[in-house]
């Protein structure tokens, strides 16, 4: 009997094993939709970004006006730009929910998949930061100045590293040009890393909401989960387009409508909303180098999760105290996001410091509580 083309063609076979005949656990919930939603976000960002790059000019005298030109003169340029800017917000919403799902259900036990995922998170954050600089508004310029300046905290190499990154003695034309270059290339690197992420995931198969081995009870990915994913696509695209058409600048910063001026500092420099929790952690450490280390650790600490796994069950579905701690940590991150947008004054500074300690404590106390709970049940 002849095999279907999808099983015999060397190229189609790869896609078939990843998207059609992939055995998937029968009980995975909507929390497992965010992986495919992230793929959709990445495709939207690459396509809209490609068309924006055709009309954008990476020059400090022209960048702001080229973005203005895109919005005013290019056919549907306003739509491309607002889709791209708000698409980034949706990308981060999906990433944070995806990571949160991974922490809750113990998906970090797939060590290589998890580590690649954290690297992808770092790459996406770098891409988004550089993209924010490109319109060359006030917040773009000052955000770039403040964040790149953090590298000067590195002992011995700091200042040289900053000047090398800037391509001069200040954020200038060379900085904008290289940021545009990296902003263009990084999404394709993210795409390649995503392939590796999936490759590692498909070695082990997906986790599921009860955290048990589901090999005896699996169903093909298509049609069951392809349709389930399409429902997720429709919901996300509906919300994204509603935001883009009703309030496209809701998540942006008003300061970025002012062309960059090195002589005027904005009253309150802050990044986009999806970086505010990390920015609050950075600001809560009085020492510059300490702040930079805390900033990097706020994401890098996710990498330690696979290595200190002490629990008998996968995930925290069966650990009530850990569930309370998990949701408390989520509230902590939301409060840190709020603090990051507040001015540097009391009581915000103290609240930020307390929340930072609580945030990092979660990763240290959580495995100990699971161990204690397991001993209690013995």
UniProtKB/Swiss-Prot annotation:
Q: What is its main location?
A: mitochondrion
One Pfam family of this protein, by short name? Cytochrom_B_C
Q: Which GO terms describe its cellular component?
A: membrane; mitochondrial inner membrane; respiratory chain complex III
Positions that bind heme b b566: 98, 197
Q: Enumerate the PROSITE patterns for this protein.
A: CYTB_CTER, CYTB_NTER
What cofactor does its activity depend on?
Answer: heme b
UniProt keywords (A-Z) are: Electron transport, Heme, Iron, Membrane, Metal-binding, Mitochondrion, Mitochondrion inner membrane, Respiratory chain, Transmembrane, Transmembrane helix, Transport, Ubiquinone
Q: Which GO terms describe its biological process?
A: mitochondrial electron transport, ubiquinol to cytochrome c; spermatogenesis
By its UniProt entry, which InterPro entries does this protein fall under? Answer: Cyt_b/b6_C (IPR005798), Cyt_b/b6_C_sf (IPR036150), Cyt_b/b6_N (IPR005797), Cytb/b6-like_sf (IPR027387), Cytochrome_b (IPR030689), Cytochrome_b_C_euk/bac (IPR048260), Cytochrome_b_N_euk/bac (IPR048259), Di-haem_cyt_TM (IPR016174)
The membrane spanning regions, by residue number, are 34-54, 78-99, 114-134, 179-199, 227-247, 289-309, 321-341, 348-368
Query: Subunit details for this protein?
Result: The main subunits of complex b-c1 are: cytochrome b, cytochrome c1 and the Rieske protein.
Additional remarks? Heme 1 (or BL or b562) is low-potential and absorbs at about 562 nm, and heme 2 (or BH or b566) is high-potential and absorbs at about 566 nm.
State the family it belongs to: Belongs to the cytochrome b family.
- Please state what the protein is called: Cytochrome b
Name the gene for this chain: mt:Cyt-b
